[in-house]
């Protein structure tokens, strides 16, 4: 089956600190996005890779490995995350794509096995996404004080890549009014079932300064350093 990967990297997040959005900050000597793209370019069965960028980042994006050679296609993002994903989905229309992976550009440590088992879950459902069960105690707070606890039974921390049958998620995005937190929300609004796939604690989203140090340690371990 023909599969495309959409890497969403049009955000301007600043919680990581620094002068650049987190996906463009250096990680082990390369931009975060370079690691993310390498994972999908190496993934079995992915025939096209689309990188969704902010218009201001085009020069940076053109310098990434794979872009100049045409192995990574650039798509300009929209005013929101779901609009950015929709732009990429529309760019694939009519290309014979059957499955699509949608991934946060700021998750550079996605493993080949996670990509493979997420795609495999599409055999039994129109959507699939990795997640990790919540294991910590959960509190409700107000005014800086704990005011209650929350049962964590059945709660998961969502990850990406989120995989879908292409035509189903394209139709779901076209029908959605916008404002979704992720593509699972868009899919469920359209009545699509989404299978939960076993996620990975190391598949972190670099969001805060400390995340970069952790990601560098994990990369060093993976390289045997």
Swiss-Prot record:
<dbReference type="Pfam" id="PF01128">
    <property type="entry name" value="IspD"/>
</dbReference>
<protein>
    <recommendedName>
        <fullName>2-C-methyl-D-erythritol 4-phosphate cytidylyltransferase</fullName>
        <ecNumber>2.7.7.60</ecNumber>
    </recommendedName>
</protein>
<keyword id="KW-0548">Nucleotidyltransferase</keyword>
<feature type="site" description="Transition state stabilizer">
    <location>
        <position position="22"/>
    </location>
</feature>
<comment type="pathway">
    <text>Isoprenoid biosynthesis; isopentenyl diphosphate biosynthesis via DXP pathway; isopentenyl diphosphate from 1-deoxy-D-xylulose 5-phosphate: step 2/6.</text>
</comment>
<dbReference type="InterPro" id="IPR001228">
    <property type="entry name" value="IspD"/>
</dbReference>
<dbReference type="InterPro" id="IPR050088">
    <property type="entry name" value="IspD/TarI_cytidylyltransf_bact"/>
</dbReference>
<feature type="site" description="Positions MEP for the nucleophilic attack">
    <location>
        <position position="205"/>
    </location>
</feature>
<feature type="site" description="Positions MEP for the nucleophilic attack">
    <location>
        <position position="152"/>
    </location>
</feature>
<dbReference type="InterPro" id="IPR018294">
    <property type="entry name" value="ISPD_synthase_CS"/>
</dbReference>
<dbReference type="InterPro" id="IPR029044">
    <property type="entry name" value="Nucleotide-diphossugar_trans"/>
</dbReference>
<comment type="similarity">
    <text>Belongs to the IspD/TarI cytidylyltransferase family. IspD subfamily.</text>
</comment>
<feature type="site" description="Transition state stabilizer">
    <location>
        <position position="15"/>
    </location>
</feature>
<dbReference type="GO" id="GO:0019288">
    <property type="term" value="P:isopentenyl diphosphate biosynthetic process, methylerythritol 4-phosphate pathway"/>
</dbReference>
<keyword id="KW-0808">Transferase</keyword>
<comment type="function">
    <text>Catalyzes the formation of 4-diphosphocytidyl-2-C-methyl-D-erythritol from CTP and 2-C-methyl-D-erythritol 4-phosphate (MEP).</text>
</comment>
<dbReference type="InterPro" id="IPR034683">
    <property type="entry name" value="IspD/TarI"/>
</dbReference>
<keyword id="KW-0414">Isoprene biosynthesis</keyword>
<dbReference type="GO" id="GO:0050518">
    <property type="term" value="F:2-C-methyl-D-erythritol 4-phosphate cytidylyltransferase activity"/>
</dbReference>
């Amino acid at each position: 089956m023909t599969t495309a990967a959409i890497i969403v990297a049009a955000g301007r997040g600043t919680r990581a600190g620094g002068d650049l959005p987190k996906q463009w900050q250096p990680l082990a000597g390369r931009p975060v996005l370079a690691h993310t793209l390498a994972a999908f370019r190496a993934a079995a069965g992915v025939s096209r890779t689309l990188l969704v960028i902010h218009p201001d980042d085009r020069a940076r994006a053109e310098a990434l490995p794979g872009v100049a050679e045409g192995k990574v296609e650039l798509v300009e993002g929209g005013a929101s995350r779901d609009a950015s994903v929709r732009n990429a989905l529309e760019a694939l229309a009519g290309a014979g794509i059957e499955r699509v992976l949608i991934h946060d550009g700021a998750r550079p440590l996605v493993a080949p096995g996670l990509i493979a088992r997420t795609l495999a879950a599409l055999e039994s459902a129109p959507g699939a996404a990795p997640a990790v069960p919540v294991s910590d105690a959960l509190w409700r707070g107000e005014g800086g004080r704990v005011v209650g606890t929350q049962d964590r039974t059945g709660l998961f921390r969502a990850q990406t890549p989120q995989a879908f049958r292409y035509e189903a998620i394209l139709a779901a995005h076209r029908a959605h009014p916008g404002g979704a937190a992720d593509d699972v929300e868009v899919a469920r609004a359209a009545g699509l079932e989404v299978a939960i796939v076993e996620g990975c604690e190391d598949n972190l989203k670099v969001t805060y300064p400390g995340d970069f140090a952790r990601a560098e340690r994990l990369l060093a371990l993976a390289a045997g350093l």
